[in-house]
Amino acid sequence: VPRGNRYFVPGQIYHLTHRCHNRQFLLRFAHDKNAYRKKLREAVSEFELALLDYCQTSNHVHLLAFAEETEQISGFMQMVEGEFAQSYNRRKHRSGAYWDDRFHSTTIQSGQHLVECMTYIALNMGRCGVVQHPREWDWCGYHELMGFRKRFRVLDITTLLSLLACDDISDFRRQYEWRLNEKIARSVMAREPRWTEAIAVGSESFVRQIATLIKGRQSLEITGEGENWSLKEGETSYHVPHRVNHKESRSFQWDEAP
């Protein structure tokens, strides 16, 4: 059963990443990626968790989810990763590990940082040169976010819009498409380790609050500047007396795109 790094705080957005064992391309075939997405739908329904975005590659997955309770994340990942791995091994007459031991979770602040994380996830296959635009890759959230996928949907668009303080799905789609095209046009698609290696990403106040709420962790480090800060394992501990308030961080200007 896959295990996470257990940096969980209730009522947060999590970017979950997990690699196939030894970076093997165990998801390279379309029917395997489709089977994984089917298991995603089943697990979302089972644990009533809000899946906001995803991208399946040939050797790892990105899942962006919002959970009110930390147990939802653990149960969700055990069902998706564990049951899919067992099914795969049975079909392929295979034994041994399917996933690397632990999946990684990065807590993402709502609003601006959520949009940036979604953009990063969407451009994953472009970074490795497989496609030029996420519309060319079937196994990602782009098609559902843009309204192209009508059947077998897995994303919770209502919760996503709430976390972005956006009332109009058309505004979201216009801004989302513009951001993707702008980064593609400027070739701004380099890997950014903070989205997949940090414990939390957001404003300075947000990551400080997350650091306080992670119990039993004595070695944490906060780095960044401006509005972009990250929390990671390190040598410094922080104490902030307040809980995270997502309502203060959801404001996002949706009319920036031309």
Language-model features, listed with the residues they occupy:
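N-terminal functional module of multi-domain proteins
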Residues: H62-L64
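Short Pro-Cys-Gly-centered "Cys-loop" motif that presents a nucleophilic cysteine in a tight turn
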Residues: V1-T57, F66-P258
